[in-house]
């Protein structure tokens, strides 16, 4: 008899474990489905009623446990009243005698942005207001007219940069179609200068430094590129410059070289191996790109102006002509169209 009782207890315990395991699995499946349903719909604000009333009298759920059941799910609020007046020792399950009417609340929330306690107008509906020419922008997406009835879960935004000067960076690796599309954008006006000298400029970089070149020194394997800060930057702060140059000998352009890999903030930068000891006047094209706080600029400026830096060697005399220069600054695309 004791063995039979022990087997019964083990059977009951195993049944309880199986029942608990089944309950946990059902609960997990329910929450998983609930999460998937959450992801398929846009979040909606829900207002839950503070108090339920019956015959103009507030209902106290704690005072009558089991009689009143108030639930709020998916924006639908229900009140269930169980009328159980019979008393007996057995358990009884009675259907509810009355249900409160189903109702839903629909409203449009109002979003208001503040700065320093003062309300401000947002540039795009539902987005925080920001000052112009900041280091980030707000992109709004419109729902397509025909979507086949399928729910839209999100949007993908493609971003590209034009005329990359840092080829080593992965973000600058664009396909030919992207490069062709970016090259077709309108150009912004030139906003800076590059001056090449054989000495460190003693004063602020400017066009007058191009005329002050020491012709008594022998030809060096480097040049000093002086950079003047652009006058128009679109309100963005310049944090440094990238200098690229290319040698053109007898009309044949050489490969473009990067003078610096890291952005420099000095007014002049020494470009190593910028001259070559070959007959003929080598032309040297410099390109300068300004880096702003938001990263590299994506609007290429037009080429404008010519500068001349002359050198003298014991056995060779020639002039190094700076055929053109470019300075890129951050200018919004809308302003670039209006200026072009």
UniProtKB/Swiss-Prot annotation:
Keyword entries, A-Z: Cytoplasm, Muscle protein
Region called Disordered, residue ranges: 177-212
Main location class: cytoplasm
Tissue: Seems to be expressed in all cardiac and skeletal fibers.
GO cellular component: M band
Domain of life: Eukaryota
UniProt-recorded Gene Ontology molecular function terms: protein homodimerization activity
Biased composition (Acidic residues): 197-206
Protein location: Cytoplasm, Myofibril, Sarcomere, M line
This protein's record includes keyword Cytoplasm: yes
Assembly and oligomerization: Homodimer. Interacts with TTN/titin and PNKD.
Stated role: Major component of the vertebrate myofibrillar M band. Binds myosin, titin, and light meromyosin. This binding is dose dependent.
Protein name: Myomesin-1
Gene source species: Bos taurus
GN (gene name): MYOM1
């Amino acid at each position: 008899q004791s063995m039979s009782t022990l087997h019964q207890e083990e059977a009951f315990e195993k049944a309880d474990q199986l029942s608990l395991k089944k309950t946990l699995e059902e609960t997990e499946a329910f929450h998983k489905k609930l999460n998937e349903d959450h992801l398929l719909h846009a979040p909606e604000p829900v207002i839950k009623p503070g108090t339920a009333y019956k015959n103009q009298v507030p209902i106290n759920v704690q005072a009558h446990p089991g009689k009143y059941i108030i639930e709020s799910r998916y924006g639908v609020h229900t009140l269930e009243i169980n009328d159980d007046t019979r008393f007996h020792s057995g358990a009884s399950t009675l259907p509810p005698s009355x249900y409160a009417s189903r109702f839903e609340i629909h409203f449009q929330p109002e979003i208001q942005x503040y700065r320093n306690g003062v309300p401000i107008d947002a540039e795009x509906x539902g987005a925080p207001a920001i000052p112009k020419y900041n280091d980030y922008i707000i992109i709004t997406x419109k729902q397509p007219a025909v979507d086949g009835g399928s729910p839209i879960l999100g949007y993908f935004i493609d971003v590209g940069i034009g005329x990359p000067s840092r080829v080593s960076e992965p973000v600058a690796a664009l396909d030919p179609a992207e490069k062709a599309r970016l090259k077709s954008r309108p150009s912004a006006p030139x906003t800076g200068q590059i001056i090449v000298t054989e000495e460190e400029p003693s004063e602020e970089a400017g066009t007058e430094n191009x005329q002050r070149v020491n012709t008594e020194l022998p030809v060096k394997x480097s040049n000093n590129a002086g950079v003047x800060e652009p006058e128009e930057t679109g309100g963005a702060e310049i944090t440094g410059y990238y200098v690229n140059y290319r040698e053109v000998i007898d009309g044949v352009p050489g490969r473009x070289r990067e003078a610096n890999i890291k952005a420099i903030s000095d007014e002049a930068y020494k470009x190593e191996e910028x001259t070559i000891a070959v007959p003929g006047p080598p032309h040297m094209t410099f390109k300068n790109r300004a880096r702003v706080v938001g990263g590299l600029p994506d609007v290429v400026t037009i080429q404008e102006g010519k500068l001349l830096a002359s050198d003298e060697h014991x056995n060779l005399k020639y002039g190094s002509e700076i055929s053109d220069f470019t300075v890129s600054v951050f200018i919004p695309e809308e302003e670039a169209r209006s200026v072009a």
